[in-house]
Protein backbone atom coordinates (compact mmCIF):
# COMPACT_ATOMS: atom_id res chain seq x y z
CA UNK A 1 0.00 0.00 0.00
CA UNK A 2 1.42 3.38 -0.90
CA UNK A 3 2.18 6.05 1.65
CA UNK A 4 -0.79 8.03 0.38
CA UNK A 5 -3.21 5.14 0.92
CA UNK A 6 -1.77 4.42 4.35
CA UNK A 7 -2.13 8.03 5.48
CA UNK A 8 -5.69 8.31 4.20
CA UNK A 9 -6.81 5.04 5.77
CA UNK A 10 -5.20 5.80 9.11
CA UNK A 11 -6.60 9.34 9.24
CA UNK A 12 -10.05 8.07 8.27
CA UNK A 13 -9.92 5.30 10.88
CA UNK A 14 -9.20 7.97 13.48
CA UNK A 15 -11.76 10.43 12.01
CA UNK A 16 -9.17 13.18 11.56
CA UNK A 17 -7.27 15.08 8.92
CA UNK A 18 -3.76 13.92 8.04
CA UNK A 19 -1.13 15.35 10.39
CA UNK A 20 1.68 17.60 9.20
CA UNK A 21 4.10 14.68 9.58
CA UNK A 22 1.87 12.48 7.43
CA UNK A 23 1.57 15.21 4.81
CA UNK A 24 5.37 15.51 4.78
CA UNK A 25 5.69 11.76 4.20
CA UNK A 26 3.31 12.10 1.23
CA UNK A 27 5.34 15.02 -0.09
CA UNK A 28 8.57 13.02 0.24
CA UNK A 29 6.94 10.09 -1.56
CA UNK A 30 5.79 12.29 -4.42
CA UNK A 31 9.23 13.88 -4.75
CA UNK A 32 10.76 10.46 -5.42
CA UNK A 33 8.13 9.64 -8.05
CA UNK A 34 10.24 10.68 -11.03
CA UNK A 35 13.16 8.60 -9.79
CA UNK A 36 10.98 5.55 -9.12
CA UNK A 37 9.37 5.69 -12.57
CA UNK A 38 12.80 6.18 -14.19
CA UNK A 39 14.14 3.08 -12.41
CA UNK A 40 11.12 1.01 -13.42
CA UNK A 41 11.32 2.19 -17.03
CA UNK A 42 15.03 1.33 -17.23
CA UNK A 43 14.53 -2.13 -15.76
CA UNK A 44 11.47 -2.88 -17.91
CA UNK A 45 13.10 -1.66 -21.13
CA UNK A 46 16.20 -3.75 -20.42
CA UNK A 47 14.53 -6.90 -19.10
CA UNK A 48 15.93 -9.16 -21.79
CA UNK A 49 19.46 -7.81 -21.35
CA UNK A 50 19.23 -8.03 -17.55
CA UNK A 51 17.91 -11.59 -17.61
CA UNK A 52 20.59 -12.68 -20.10
CA UNK A 53 23.36 -11.11 -18.02
CA UNK A 54 22.01 -12.51 -14.73
CA UNK A 55 21.71 -15.96 -16.29
CA UNK A 56 25.25 -15.76 -17.66
CA UNK A 57 26.60 -14.70 -14.26
CA UNK A 58 24.75 -17.48 -12.46
CA UNK A 59 25.87 -20.22 -14.87
CA UNK A 60 29.48 -19.00 -14.65
CA UNK A 61 29.37 -18.98 -10.87
CA UNK A 62 27.43 -22.23 -10.57
CA UNK A 63 27.99 -24.44 -13.63
CA UNK A 64 26.69 -27.35 -11.55
CA UNK A 65 23.18 -25.92 -11.93
CA UNK A 66 23.20 -26.61 -15.69
CA UNK A 67 25.28 -29.79 -15.55
CA UNK A 68 23.55 -33.20 -15.67
CA UNK A 69 21.68 -33.62 -12.40
CA UNK A 70 21.53 -29.86 -11.77
CA UNK A 71 18.24 -28.09 -11.19
CA UNK A 72 18.58 -26.11 -14.43
CA UNK A 73 19.82 -29.02 -16.53
CA UNK A 74 17.98 -29.41 -19.81
CA UNK A 75 16.10 -26.94 -21.97
CA UNK A 76 12.85 -27.08 -20.00
CA UNK A 77 14.45 -26.54 -16.61
CA UNK A 78 16.70 -23.80 -17.94
CA UNK A 79 13.69 -22.04 -19.51
CA UNK A 80 11.84 -22.17 -16.18
CA UNK A 81 14.82 -20.62 -14.43
CA UNK A 82 15.03 -17.83 -17.00
CA UNK A 83 11.27 -17.29 -16.69
CA UNK A 84 11.69 -16.86 -12.94
CA UNK A 85 14.36 -14.19 -13.49
CA UNK A 86 11.86 -12.14 -15.50
CA UNK A 87 9.13 -12.73 -12.95
CA UNK A 88 11.28 -11.54 -10.05
CA UNK A 89 12.46 -8.50 -12.00
CA UNK A 90 8.84 -7.54 -12.68
CA UNK A 91 7.98 -8.07 -9.01
CA UNK A 92 10.82 -5.77 -8.00
CA UNK A 93 9.58 -3.05 -10.35
CA UNK A 94 6.19 -3.19 -8.61
CA UNK A 95 7.86 -2.54 -5.27
CA UNK A 96 10.02 0.28 -6.65
CA UNK A 97 7.00 1.92 -8.28
CA UNK A 98 4.95 1.71 -5.08
CA UNK A 99 7.90 2.79 -2.95
CA UNK A 100 7.01 -0.12 -0.69
CA UNK A 101 7.69 -3.84 -0.30
CA UNK A 102 3.99 -4.65 0.05
CA UNK A 103 3.44 -5.57 -3.63
CA UNK A 104 6.47 -7.86 -3.46
CA UNK A 105 5.16 -9.44 -0.30
CA UNK A 106 1.55 -9.84 -1.43
CA UNK A 107 2.16 -10.94 -5.00
CA UNK A 108 5.09 -13.21 -4.68
CA UNK A 109 7.24 -13.62 -1.63
CA UNK A 110 4.92 -15.17 0.92
CA UNK A 111 5.47 -18.91 0.84
CA UNK A 112 8.27 -18.78 -1.73
CA UNK A 113 10.65 -20.89 0.37
CA UNK A 114 8.02 -23.58 0.82
CA UNK A 115 7.17 -23.55 -2.88
CA UNK A 116 10.78 -23.97 -3.99
CA UNK A 117 11.40 -26.64 -1.36
CA UNK A 118 8.32 -28.57 -2.53
CA UNK A 119 9.56 -28.37 -6.13
CA UNK A 120 13.01 -29.57 -5.12
CA UNK A 121 14.62 -26.25 -6.07
CA UNK A 122 17.46 -25.40 -3.70
CA UNK A 123 16.61 -22.10 -2.02
CA UNK A 124 20.30 -21.11 -1.66
CA UNK A 125 20.51 -21.40 -5.46
CA UNK A 126 17.56 -19.04 -5.81
CA UNK A 127 19.29 -16.58 -3.51
CA UNK A 128 22.33 -16.72 -5.79
CA UNK A 129 20.04 -16.22 -8.79
CA UNK A 130 18.45 -13.10 -7.25
CA UNK A 131 21.91 -11.78 -6.39
CA UNK A 132 22.88 -12.19 -10.06
CA UNK A 133 19.66 -10.44 -11.10
CA UNK A 134 20.42 -7.63 -8.66
CA UNK A 135 23.93 -7.10 -10.01
CA UNK A 136 22.82 -7.18 -13.65
CA UNK A 137 20.01 -4.72 -12.89
CA UNK A 138 21.91 -2.27 -10.73
CA UNK A 139 24.78 -2.13 -13.23
CA UNK A 140 22.38 -0.39 -15.64
CA UNK A 141 21.32 2.29 -13.15
CA UNK A 142 23.04 5.42 -11.88
CA UNK A 143 24.52 5.07 -8.41
CA UNK A 144 21.63 7.07 -6.93
CA UNK A 145 18.99 4.96 -8.69
CA UNK A 146 20.85 1.75 -7.82
CA UNK A 147 20.84 2.76 -4.15
CA UNK A 148 17.08 3.32 -4.34
CA UNK A 149 16.39 -0.01 -6.09
CA UNK A 150 18.79 -2.25 -4.14
CA UNK A 151 16.60 -2.64 -1.02
CA UNK A 152 13.85 -4.31 -3.07
CA UNK A 153 16.28 -6.96 -4.30
CA UNK A 154 17.65 -7.29 -0.77
CA UNK A 155 14.16 -7.81 0.61
CA UNK A 156 13.61 -10.79 -1.69
CA UNK A 157 17.07 -12.17 -0.91
CA UNK A 158 16.43 -11.84 2.82
CA UNK A 159 12.98 -13.43 2.54
CA UNK A 160 14.51 -16.43 0.77
CA UNK A 161 17.47 -16.77 3.15
Curated annotation (Swiss-Prot):
The protein's name: Allophycocyanin subunit alpha-B
Modified residues (N4-methylasparagine): 71
PANTHER family for this protein: ALLOPHYCOCYANIN ALPHA CHAIN, PHYCOBILISOME 32.1 KDA LINKER POLYPEPTIDE, PHYCOCYANIN-ASSOCIATED, ROD 2-RELATED
Annotated source species: Nostoc sp. (strain PCC 7120 / SAG 25.82 / UTEX 2576)
Keywords for the protein's UniProt record, in alphabetical order: Antenna complex, Bile pigment, Chromophore, Electron transport, Membrane, Methylation, Photosynthesis, Phycobilisome, Thylakoid, Transport
UniProt-listed SUPFAM superfamilies: Globin-like
Entry-linked InterPro entries: Globin-like_sf (IPR009050), Phycobilisome_asu/bsu (IPR012128), Phycobilisome_asu/bsu_sf (IPR038719)
Quaternary structure note: Heterohexamer of two alpha chains, one alpha-B chain and three beta chains.
GO biological process, one term: photosynthesis
A Pfam cross-reference name: Phycobilisome
Top-level lineage group: Bacteria
Membrane topology of the entry: Peripheral membrane protein
Role this protein plays: Light-harvesting photosynthetic bile pigment-protein from the phycobiliprotein complex. Allophycocyanin has a maximum absorption at approximately 654 nanometers.
Subcellular location: Cellular thylakoid membrane
Record family assignment: Belongs to the phycobiliprotein family.
PTM characteristics: Contains one covalently linked phycocyanobilin chromophore. The chromophore is added by phycocyanobilin lyase CpcS 1.
CC annotations in GO: phycobilisome; plasma membrane-derived thylakoid membrane
Membrane-spanning intervals of the chain: none
Amino acid sequence: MTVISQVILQADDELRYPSSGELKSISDFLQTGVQRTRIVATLAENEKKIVQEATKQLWQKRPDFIAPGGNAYGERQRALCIRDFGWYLRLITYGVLAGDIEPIEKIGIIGVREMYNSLGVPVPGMVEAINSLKKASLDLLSSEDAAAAAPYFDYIIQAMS
